[in-house]
């Protein structure tokens, strides 16, 4: 068995789950090897690593983290210089709601062909219930002046929803939500972790997180 050298993150640039994992790794200043995956042509090395065959997937020396929130928690347990984990327990309830009801409604709005029995307009209304809740909480972030793991976990999905129909989204009376999202999209952290890299192939020179995002 080859000697373990460095944690390896399998990722896909636009995937909101992968985005939030990369954000946490960036904030934690964790140096991992990053491998961009083409989802329609998954390498066998990735499938051998990831039990679910989904991104993100982080290979550690003794285990594999196959859930984005687990990757976030692991990274911030190693190093949390901006206290992202410092938030009320309710923050994890919001993440669960985002990953549950909101994501289901988002998918049925964004991908109507995949869900022919779902009405995209009604699905958008269902998703909006969660966004209204966030609108009433934000000040300017979910728990005050400082970002938390909840902000980083939820924002990529709000971004994905907004991009379904940006004209409609920006017409809504979501003053706090729109400011929150726009600030996120304009942040150096977000733009760093959205840097494009080529698809990983066996034999490639390792692309390190520190070289790509932490410089």
Where is each model-derived feature located?
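Short helix-capping/linker segments at secondary-structure and domain boundaries
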Residues: 29-31, 116, 161-169
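GST superfamily/GST-like fold recognition
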Residues: 144-167
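Acidic/histidine-enriched, glycine/proline-rich intrinsically disordered or flexible terminal extensions
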Residues: 197-215
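GST-like domain detector, emphasizing the conserved glutathione-binding G-site
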Residues: 1-142
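A contiguous, mid-protein "functional segment" used to position or interact
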Residues: 171-199
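Catalytic cores of nucleotide-enabled group-transfer and carboxylate-activating enzymes in metabolic
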Residues: 84, 132-135, 155-163, 185
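Structural helix-adjacent loops and short alpha-helical linkers that scaffold large soluble proteins
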Residues: 81-84, 168-172
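Surface-exposed helix-capping loop/turn segments at secondary-structure junctions
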Residues: 136-145, 189-194
């Amino acid at each position: 068995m080859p000697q373990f050298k460095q944690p390896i993150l399998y990722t896909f640039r636009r995937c909101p789950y992968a985005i939030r994992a990369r954000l946490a790794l960036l904030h934690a200043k964790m140096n991992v090897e990053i491998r961009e995956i083409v989802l329609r042509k998954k390498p066998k090395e990735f499938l051998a690593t990831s039990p679910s065959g989904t991104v993100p997937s982080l290979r550690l020396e003794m285990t594999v983290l196959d859930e984005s929130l687990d990757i976030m928690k692991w990274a911030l347990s190693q190093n949390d210089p901006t206290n992202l984990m410092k938030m009320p327990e309710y923050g994890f309830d919001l993440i669960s709601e985002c990953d549950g009801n909101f994501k289901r409604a988002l998918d049925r709005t964004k991908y109507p062909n995949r869900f022919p029995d779902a009405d995209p307009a009604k699905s958008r209304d269902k998703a909006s219930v969660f966004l209204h809740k966030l609108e009433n909480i934000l000040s300017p972030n979910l728990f005050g002046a400082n970002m938390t793991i909840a902000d980083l976990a939820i924002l990529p999905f709000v971004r994905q929803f907004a991009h379904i129909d940006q004209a409609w989204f920006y017409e809504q009376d979501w003053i706090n939500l729109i400011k929150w999202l726009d600030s996120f999209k304009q942040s150096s952290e977000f733009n760093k972790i959205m840097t494009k890299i080529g698809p990983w192939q066996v034999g490639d020179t390792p692309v390190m997180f520190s070289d790509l995002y932490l410089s």
